[in-house]
UniProtKB/Swiss-Prot annotation:
Top-level taxonomic group: Bacteria
Membrane topology: Multi-pass membrane protein
UniProt entry tagged with the keyword tRNA processing: no
Protein name: NADH-quinone oxidoreductase subunit N
Biological processes, Gene Ontology terms: ATP synthesis coupled electron transport
Length: 481
């Protein structure tokens, strides 16, 4: 190890130091100052990540700390994207002005640190430690409200199932090591290319199960809905903005530039992608709670992105487009939802919202329609790019055609629950004697909602030029991904 290697990890070291300082400061200062310090620290991490990517021109892969960390153009960009996601989540929490203990912001910093190191892991050891750091921190965020029975139940379910997925991943890592005598993540790319024995392929499949569990892909999704339902709204925003982005970027890097060529694993992931789209969209149709509806909706969206990730890996810019679009839409949605209390939140409580808070009602409806992917709203472009990529790929028609037909059919389902939300907000009457109290004024959340609206409009006109724009970003970072 040398000082040059530590300089590469400056954003992570700064984030770790900020988390430790915030943990100590919380003992002597008010919790609000710790929340502000955490948000500022995430902003500094974004700047440091940008500076590190622009100044460190890497012509080839650089292995740091004896291979534990992989430093490439892709990992630099992924680290910066995860840092921006953490900054957005911190801003949402800060602007919501939640009266919670200072440890919430500190745990968010540690979870973001785990996500940032996860996308740079070059060794199975660092990958597993980063994954567990993020998972354990997420478990603390879920059960932060200790007086809530639902939160405790959700955290217990998340913890037990996370432990199960960790055991499966560790067993897969042991199989990969036993058959390939290597623990570098690059070994998986050779195995997934079809140049390994059955045991090594099975080990890779078990490792992928751990990543798919983190994404809540069917059939590894049973924890997500109840966990999101019981967690605080700010924690749910963090999961959908930060953790989900990190898991997708990690999966693309594990697959590599050429994608998965091992047909058994490739067709298996395409199958679970179709099931995710089906279960997610149909499951959201039955929900009366907004948290559970969003959980199922995000499970359904994974059915579109996963096939492109495993087919093209890091060579597809559509993955980055989806990550950025997901940020904007989720930040837009939670800029509305964070105005409410964490408990309950049934759709019926939105009745008559347009009378007391017309802007909030409009923002909620339009953001949900964007999340559903209706043309010409922002969410339709990633789905279009993904389906186009599947159709133009080398997948046999007997596999691609049923998948495309299925996701196109279930893509109609979101219109029903989106229109139901619009009906409740604009046409339903509040319960007798309940009324709809005016929401407290949150200037910060309103600014975030307006910014997300403007970004959505701009992105609509620039969506077809995203490849050119992202190539410019790669050029600024001094190379190719």
């Amino acid at each position: 190890m040398c000082w040059r290697e530590l300089l590469y990890m400056l954003p992570e070291l700064y984030l770790l130091g900020s988390a430790m300082i915030a943990l100590l400061l919380g003992i002597v200062v008010d919790a609000r100052w710790v929340h502000r310090l955490s948000a500022v620290s995430m902003g500094v991490v974004v700047v440091l990540s940008w500076w590190s990517g622009v100044t460190d021109h890497v012509a080839e892969d650089v292995h740091l700390f004896n291979g534990l960390v992989l430093h490439t153009r892709y990992t630099c960009i992924s680290r910066m994207l995860v840092g921006v996601a953490g900054f957005v989540a911190s801003l949402l929490f800060l602007c919501a002005r939640r009266e919670v203990r200072y440890e919430f912001s500190v745990v968010m910093l540690f979870a973001t640190l785990g996500a940032m190191t996860l996308v740079q892991a070059g060794h199975f050891l660092s990958l597993y430690i980063s994954l567990e750091l993020n998972s354990l921190s997420s478990c603390v965020l879920v059960c932060f409200n200790r007086s809530s029975e639902r939160a405790s139940e959700s955290a217990l379910k998340f913890f037990i199932l996370s432990a199960l997925s960790s055991c499966i991943m560790l067993y897969g890592i042991s199989l990969v090591y036993g058959y390939s005598t290597g623990l570098e993540c690059n070994v998986m790319q050779e195995i997934l290319a079809g140049r390994a024995s059955l045991g090594a392929t099975l080990g890779c499949a078990f490792v992928l199960v751990g990543v798919l569990f983190k994404l809540a892909v069917v059939p590894f999704h049973m924890w997500a809905v109840d966990t999101y339902h019981g967690s605080p709204m700010a924690a749910m925003a963090f999961f959908l903005i930060v953790t989900k982005s990190a898991a997708i970027l990690l999966l693309a890097r594990i697959v590599g530039e050429n994608g998965i060529l091992q047909q058994s694993i490739l067709y298996g992931i395409i199958s679970v992608s179709g099931l995710s789209a089906l279960v997610g969209e149909l499951g959201a149709l039955r929900q009366s709670n907004i948290k559970r509806l969003l959980a199922y909706s995000n499970i359904g969206q994974l059915g579109y992105v996963l096939p492109v990730v495993v087919l093209h890996g890091t060579s597809s810019y559509a993955i980055f487009h989806y990550v950025l679009t997901s940020w904007v839409i989720n930040a837009w949605i939670f800029s509305v939802l964070l105005r409410y209390d964490d408990e309950g939140f049934e759709l019926a409580s939105l009745a008559g919202m347009h009378r007391s808070s017309p802007f909030v009602a409009f923002a909620l409806v339009v953001s949900m329609v964007s999340a559903a992917g209706f043309p010409p709203f922002l969410g339709c472009w990633p789905k279009y790019f993904f389906l186009k990529s599947i159709v133009m790929s080398d997948i046999p028609t007997v596999v691609a055609f049923p998948y495309v037909l299925l996701v196109c059919a279930v893509g109609i389902v979101p219109c029903f629950y989106c229109f139901r939300i619009a009906r409740v907000v604009y046409f339903d009457q509040p319960a007798m004697g309940a009324g709809h109290p005016a929401l407290p004024h949150h200037l910060g959340l309103t600014v975030i909602a307006v910014v997300c609206m403007l970004l959505s409009v701009i992105a609509l006109f620039l969506a077809q030029y995203f490849d050119i724009l992202f190539q410019g970003l790669v050029w600024v970072f001094g190379g190719r991904t």
